[in-house]
Amino acid sequence: MKQKVVSIGDINVANDLPFVLFGGMNVLESRDLAMRICEHYVTVTQKLGIPYVFKASFDKANRSSIHSYRGPGLEEGMKIFEEIKKTFGVKTITDVHEASQAQPVSEVVDVIQLPAFLARQTDLVEAMAKTGAVINVKKPQFVSPGQMGNIVDKFKEGGNDQVILCDRGSNFGYDNLVVDMLGINVMKNATGGHPVIFDVTHALQTRDPFGAASGGRRAQVAELARAGMAVGLAGLFIEAHPEPNSAKCDGPSALPLDKLEPFLVQMKAIDDLVKSFPELDTSN
């Protein structure tokens, strides 16, 4: 099957091309921290020759607690993204939660992301499709890989086929996630070869059944990411923080920022190796 290429400016994203890194921080905590984190990602990815897109959220609208930090909001968030793009010359990605946010965000950010909890909301999908922007769809934890074809079809009906899919794990009983590596190729096949990336950060989440914040398995980030890269991915999605234990959102799953380079050295080595192999058809 021919793999679809989705272009983010001069960055080509496809299942059979070198992987693209979608990385940054979970939520915009401050302008200065965002600049610091982006600068480190840019330095490391340029050194290693990895195509890079900066990620952060301007509003975490789905926090468990009403008291949890959500972010700077749309207006201030777009100012930070504009400065990051101007300063570092990077492409950017962020999520939207309401149909009214799609157009103004797409005027600043290069890729707009459809959150997992909202991936079947048709009005939001249609609003995002109308922007013409590249779309990243998070696979809901409660949706099977094969069902992702229906979500992609909604975007195509809305006139936009520039869609990337992102696996972030599936529900495994209550308050736990598991990643079905076989589902990666199921998503590729169900969508006619659309690029599939893997969000290793959020796949590491755990929950206290009665708690108001997510836990995580940061110590296992490398082993889970290595497994994903071995399947063959269009990209890897990861969040990092200089002080994960002090992060305002999802710190327990965040990669320590100073571990980014050795982490990516491993990921690139696996990606290069896997994509050097000829295709092996074992179906017959």
Curated annotation (Swiss-Prot):
A Pfam match: DAHP_synth_1
Mind telling me which InterPro entries this protein's record contains? Answer: Aldolase_TIM, DAHP1/KDSA, KDO8P_synthase
For biological process, the GO terms are: keto-3-deoxy-D-manno-octulosonic acid biosynthetic process
Cellular location(s)? Cytoplasm
Q: Which GO terms describe its cellular component?
A: cytoplasm
Q: Which reaction does it catalyse?
A: D-arabinose 5-phosphate + phosphoenolpyruvate + H2O = 3-deoxy-alpha-D-manno-2-octulosonate-8-phosphate + phosphate
Q: What is its main location?
A: cytoplasm
Q: Which GO terms describe its molecular function?
A: 3-deoxy-8-phosphooctulonate synthase activity
Name its pathway.
Carbohydrate biosynthesis; 3-deoxy-D-manno-octulosonate biosynthesis; 3-deoxy-D-manno-octulosonate from D-ribulose 5-phosphate: step 2/3; Bacterial outer membrane biogenesis; lipopolysaccharide biosynthesis
Q: What class of enzyme is it?
A: transferase
Q: List UniProt keywords, sorted A-Z.
A: Cytoplasm, Lipopolysaccharide biosynthesis, Transferase
Q: What is its EC number?
A: 2.5.1.55
Q: Give the family this protein belongs to, as stated in its UniProt record.
A: Belongs to the KdsA family.
Name of this protein: 2-dehydro-3-deoxyphosphooctonate aldolase
